[in-house]
Each structure stands twice: as C-alpha cells, then as structure tokens.
C-alpha cells in the first residue's frame, strides 16, 4: 500500500487540486445554456422530447405551469430508468443516446427533483476517469511520471477541460472515449493482446453512440495505426484492428437506425 501511494502520490495530488477547482466552479454555476436544459428534457421527459409535445405540438396561446416544466425536466416516480423513452426521444433529436442514458440513470435516483448537481457529479466522475486515462496514455508514450502528471494538470485545469465538465452535455463523455481509444491503440503498439481488439471496437461504437463527430477522430487515429501496422509488416494485426474498428462503426446502424436520418437530413443539424 505504501509503495502504491508513493508511486501515485503526484497523480493523486494533481487530481485533488483539479477536484477542488471543479467543485469550486460547479458551486458557482448559475443558470444553464438552452442545450443543457434540453439535455435534461430529452433524458428525463417520458416519451416527450420537446416542451411542445406536452401541449399537443404547439405552445401558441397556451400556458405552461411550473409543474409541467418540472415534469419535463425530471424523472417521474413511475418512469425511472426508462431507457426506451430516452432512445425514443433521441430518435426525434439530432444526437445519439449514450450520454442521455447516463443522465437518465442518475436522475432516476432523484425522481421529481430538478438540480444541476447529479449531472455535475456524473460529469466530474467521467472527467476524473478521462484524466486517469490521460495519465496512463502519457506514461505509455513517454515513460515519465513527471510528463504524465503535467499533462493531467495542463488539461485538467485548462479552460476547455473544465468547460466540458461544467457543461451538462455529452462532450465530457466524448473526451473520455477519445482518450480511451488513444490509450487502447497505444497499448496495442506495446503489446499484441487479442483482448484489445474487441475493446477498441466497443470504444469506437460507444464514441459514435455519444457524438457523431467522434467518427472524424476515430477515422484518422485508426488510419494512423493501420499505416503503422503496415510499416511494421504486421499484416495480421492490420486485419484484426481494421475489422474491430469497422465493426464498432457499423454496429451504430442496427443499434440506432435513426442516425441515418439525423446525419443525412436536408436541414443542417449539429
């Protein structure tokens, strides 16, 4: 235990400092961007993705009560852990459902209660996991604890890093999966463990189920590894890696067919 603490003391200290900053800014968060409000509604409203769905498709000349708005933003006592509702809501939105499932899961422990804290704590946990993976990635690449801890501090205290944690959107989860894919590929470069291939495929799938823009990052980082494998004449590794990554991407289609309409809609979506 003492050896473990000594080995990771600098990382733990860095995470404690970052945690303090995270909770400081979280406690000072005032109000939410409209997309954050929709994140709650899409996650927690029972088969009613938009506010207008509560009023027969239109709010013109209609009044919404406070309770109706609370019902839209929170999980009800009788519809907790409603993954099917989240899935349906996202087929009517422009994003895949992964992050919304997580928020619905967390919100289901607090039915009828609206607060930013459950989502912020969830984001904080995801953020810490991303930073630990970043540490492990830099250790693999540079074999230097100093470099790894500095990378954690530089990103963990950066404006962009903290913004992903503070904003109740899918971007912090996207960051985690981005670092995870890089880490798994770096592991594969150091050790040819067969178990890494399905993990890479699952990560690609999870990334695409979180945010469609993940495809651009995944394409180029996977292409880079394919080139590396060909240069090393590791043809077996090239085939297995390519199949794993491709399977992860293709699995998006049967898992969330609505992605086709969302990606190729006539109207510009994000």
Where are these predicted regions, by residue range?
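Specific aromatic-rich, kink-prone transmembrane helix
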Residues: 105, 133-136, 153, 157, ...
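Helix-to-loop transition at the C-terminal end of transmembrane segments
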Residues: 21-38, 55-60, 253-269
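Loop-to-helix entry region of an early transmembrane alpha helix in multi-pass inner-membrane enzymes
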Residues: 88, 92-101, 109-129
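Perimembrane helix-loop-helix junctions
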Residues: 182-199, 204, 216-250, 261-264, ...
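Short acidic/glycine- and proline-prone juxtamembrane loop motifs at membrane-interface regions
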Residues: 166-171
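Transmembrane-helix signature of polytopic, membrane-embedded enzymes
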Residues: 117, 134-157
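Start-transfer (signal-anchor) and selected internal transmembrane alpha helices
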Residues: 1-23, 27
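Interfacial juxtamembrane loops and adjacent helix segments
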Residues: 44-95, 107-112
């Amino acid at each position: 235990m003492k050896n473990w603490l000594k080995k990771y003391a600098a990382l733990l200290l860095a995470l404690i400092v970052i945690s303090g900053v995270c909770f400081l800014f979280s406690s000072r968060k005032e109000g939410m961007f409209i997309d954050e409000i929709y994140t709650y509604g899409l996650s927690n409203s029972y088969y009613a993705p938009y506010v207008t769905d509560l009023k027969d498709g239109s709010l013109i000349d209609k009044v919404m009560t406070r309770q109706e708005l609370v019902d839209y933003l929170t999980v009800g006592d009788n519809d907790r852990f409603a993954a099917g509702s989240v899935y349906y809501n996202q087929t009517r939105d422009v994003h895949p459902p992964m992050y919304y499932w997580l928020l619905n899961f967390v919100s289901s422990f607090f039915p009828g209660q609206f607060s930013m804290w459950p989502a912020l704590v969830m984001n904080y946990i995801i953020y810490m996991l991303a930073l630990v993976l970043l540490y492990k990635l830099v250790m693999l690449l540079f074999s230097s604890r100093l470099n790894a801890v500095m990378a954690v501090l530089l990103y963990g205290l950066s404006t962009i890093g903290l913004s992903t944690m503070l904003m109740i959107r899918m971007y912090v989860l996207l960051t985690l999966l981005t670092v995870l894919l890089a880490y798994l590929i770096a592991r594969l470069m150091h050790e040819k463990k067969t178990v890494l291939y399905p993990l890479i495929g699952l990560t690609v799938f999870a990334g695409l189920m979180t945010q469609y823009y993940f495809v651009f990052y995944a394409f180029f980082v996977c292409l880079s590894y394919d080139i590396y494998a060909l240069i090393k004449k590791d043809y077996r590794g090239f085939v297995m890696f390519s199949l794993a990554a491709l399977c992860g991407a293709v699995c998006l289609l049967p898992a969330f067919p609505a992605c086709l309409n969302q990606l190729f809609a006539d109207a510009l979506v994000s």
